[in-house]
Amino acid sequence: MAPISIRGVKKNYGKTPVVHGVDLDIQSGEFIVILGPSGCGKSTLLRMIAGLEEITGGEIAIDGRVVNQLEPRERGCAMVFQNYALYPHMSVAENIGYALKVAGVSKAERQRRIGEVAKALSLEPFLERRPAALSGGQRQRVAMGRAMIREPKVFLFDEPLSNLDAKLRIAMRAEIRRLHRRLGATSIFVTHDQTEAMTLADRLVVMNGGRVEQVGTPEEVYHHPVSRFVAGFVGTPAMNLLEGTINDEGVFVYDQSRKVALPRERAAPLKGKRVVLGMRAEAARLVAPDAPGALTATADFIEELGASRIVHADFDGLPFAVALTEAVKVKSGDPIGIAIDYDQIHLYAADTGRIIENPVMNNAGAVHA
């Protein structure tokens, strides 16, 4: 186990900056997930930690030791890749133990440690097989075993589950979490899949455009997104976001004429300003179209998810999602009313995309990331 300190880390390709001064502290034994869309810089950051990419600026320290100038093998990290990177001509046992063989570890010690790793990952029946005779999930476990046997200070996972089908991904997520509980090693996991991120992370690091947007627990990031980007990226369905202006009466006006009456204490300081109103699908509920204060819309389509349903509504071309927690009869084309839980709304500055703090929640002791 080892803490990791990242200070002002930058990466340029030529004159093009791709990572912009990232600062991050990772505690010893913590499981961090770096989440973001393709091209956000998450894999580049991981590769800089591993030593596979040179750092343009800043400093990375692992277990208190600055590693900027160290070779990958000197950093105490083991990496698991998306494509497994197994030797096809070697057996499972040979693949797992290869790093020890190169390091000159005795055959008896190699066999002992291969046996321990194989038992931990349920690979004992497959030790004599070659990768071509394994399923995708088994190959990924071999790749994890090859990292485990090195007994690293830090595990680095670069989208390791992307090639697996949905059922295998669920199984491997559980496998990785159990592995982390057993070994306690500091782990950094990169993904664009928010389900993976939310289920695996002790803390999430959400990246966009080479910058860190937010760091927090999955619960904090989901319930208190600090930017318009995080609000729209994290969560399925994405947070409902409506851009408009707070008029002189403290009413939120969007789409030129549609109005939402906000609580006075939220609206008063923002009169005349353009803001983005955000709310999760579960912060709204269906009511009669003529109910007092209801937003009127048309049910576009209903997403059946088994234990729950999502109604995707149409506000004259503006999308809006409502999570149904009870048996409400609604079908495509029905006129609907939507009631909003104003305690769960978020307001973002339209120009910067950053959260506008809620003074009422702050006074009540709410924590904002």
Swiss-Prot record:
* InterPro entries linked to this entry: AAA+_ATPase (IPR003593), ABC_transporter-like_ATP-bd (IPR003439), ABC_transporter-like_CS (IPR017871), ABC_transpr_MalK-like (IPR015855), ABC_transpr_MalK/UgpC-like (IPR047641), Mo/tungstate-bd_C_term_dom (IPR008995), NA-bd_OB-fold (IPR012340), OB_MalK-like (IPR040582)
Give the range the annotation lists for the signal sequence: none
Q: Which reaction does it catalyse?
A: sn-glycerol 3-phosphate(out) + ATP + H2O = sn-glycerol 3-phosphate(in) + ADP + phosphate + H(+)
Cellular component GO terms, alphabetical: ATP-binding cassette (ABC) transporter complex, substrate-binding subunit-containing
Asked if Nucleotide-binding is a keyword of the record, the answer is yes
Q: Give the SMART domains listed for this entry.
A: AAA (SM00382)
Which sequence ranges are marked TM in the entry?
A: none
| Localization in the cell | Cell inner membrane
GO molecular function terms attached to this record: ABC-type glycerol-3-phosphate transporter activity; ATP binding; ATP hydrolysis activity
Bilayer topology: Peripheral membrane protein
Task: Please list the coiled coil stretches.
Answer: none
Biological process, per Gene Ontology: carbohydrate transport; glycerophosphodiester transmembrane transport
Q: Which positions bind ATP?
A: 36-43
Primary location: membrane
- EC numbers listed for it are 7.6.2.10
UniProt name for this protein: sn-glycerol-3-phosphate import ATP-binding protein UgpC 1
Q: Which organism is it from?
A: Rhizobium johnstonii (strain DSM 114642 / LMG 32736 / 3841)
